[in-house]
Structure formats: structure tokens, C-alpha cells
């Protein structure tokens, strides 16, 4: 079974994201900040990471840079899920190593479209 790590400081967003991704057949784990997410990736590298941009302790950008430097860290597909919508943020996220970008709030259909584009749906 494919594994997804949902990284967001909002418990509500993590739960909604979990529900959507489980509907796609993923096993899901959660982290509330980038540092916790790196620890989870060391334990088990996921196939997919849904990543918030603005988080305490370690931002999404800081996380993805650290992830891509880890052993096996180039493997997971990363989708930024954020309220940051200007073109500069999108470019920064993709340049840092994200595979796709989705605006919050998102629904089942939007996420499915994005996952299809990166080969995971």
C-alpha cells in the first residue's frame, strides 16, 4: 500500500487531508511541523508528502530542502498544500523540489487531478 505523510500545523487540515488521501487507497501518517516530518521520513520514507508552507519550527520550504538532501529523499512526490498563491511562491516551491502545488482549501477532485499529474492516482 502506498504511504502518504500529511504535514500541516492545523489538526483540522491534517484530518481532512487524511480522509481524502485514504479514499485514494493510501496509508496515511501525520506530522505537525517540518522537523517532526523529517523524523517520520527517517523512520519510513513515504511515497507522497502533502506539505504545508507556513509552519512553526521548520517551514515547508526548509523541510523540502532537507528532505531532498536525505538518503532516499528524492523519492517521495511532494505536493505543497497552502494558502500562498502568488506566482513567486509557486516558483519557489517547485524550485525547492516540490512536484505539484495545490491551493487550500482543496477538495477530492482537485487533489486527484494533481496526483494524476504526478503519477500517483
Regions found by a protein language model. Give the residues of each.
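Alpha4 helix (beta4-alpha4-beta5 surface) of REC/receiver domains from two-component response regulators
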Residues: 62, 85-100, 110-113, 117
